UniProtKB/Swiss-Prot annotation:
Residues 81-110 are annotated as: Disordered. Produces ATP from ADP in the presence of a proton gradient across the membrane. It comes from Shouchella clausii (strain KSM-K16) (Alkalihalobacillus clausii). This is ATP synthase epsilon chain. It is a peripheral membrane protein. GO terms for cellular component: plasma membrane; proton-transporting ATP synthase complex. The lineage of its organism: Bacteria, Bacillati, Bacillota, Bacilli, Bacillales. F-type ATPases have 2 components, CF(1) - the catalytic core - and CF(0) - the membrane proton channel. CF(1) has five subunits: alpha(3), beta(3), gamma(1), delta(1), epsilon(1). CF(0) has three main subunits: a, b and c. One of its GO terms (molecular function) is ATP binding. Belongs to the ATPase epsilon chain family. InterPro entries: ATP_F1_dsu/esu_C_sf, ATP_synth_F1_dsu/esu, ATP_synth_F1_dsu/esu_N, ATP_synth_F1_esu_C, ATPsynth_dsu/esu_N. CDD domains: F1-ATPase_delta.
Length: 133
């Protein structure tokens, strides 16, 4: 099957470079599946995992919003923050999830910010499960 080049880039530099038969990202409109020769597009990303599938194996990167740019031969994910599974401190992510849940349980809280923090923590915990996969 044909592959497409993939780059995940943050302000701190490249987090992932490789090729995949299928790239799946979470946009603000829903999940988007991308294969080689996809029509060009740019879309804002939501917090979630970026998944790269090749030869039946899947790699993931936790993405904290940004944009995806798709060209027929390349996918660029420009993210505010992104982490590979081996970079994620699961204990720190678990504590961040607990803090976000506590904030959401209180009355005087910026709900949108707390919900975003909760989603980031959950995404990081889910992606961390793919360490060594």
């Amino acid at each position: 099957m044909a592959t497409i080049q993939v780059s995940v880039i943050t302000p701190d530099g490249a987090v992932y470079e490789g090729d995949a038969e299928l790239v799946v990202v979470k946009t603000v409109e829903g999940e988007l599946g991308i294969k080689a020769k996809h029509i060009p597009l740019v879309s804002p990303l939501a917090v979630g995992p970026a998944r790269f599938i090749k030869e039946g194996k899947e790699e993931q990167v936790a993405v904290s919003s940004g944009f995806v740019e798709v060209r027929p031969d390349h996918v660029s994910i420009l993210a505010e923050a992104a982490e590979r599974p081996e970079q994620i401190d699961t204990e720190r992510a678990r504590k961040a999830k607990e803090r976000a849940e506590q904030r959401l349980a209180s009355e005087h809280v910026d709900r949108k910010r707390a919900e975003a923090a909760l989603q980031r923590a959950i995404t990081r915990m889910d992606v961390a499960k793919h360490k060594g996969a």
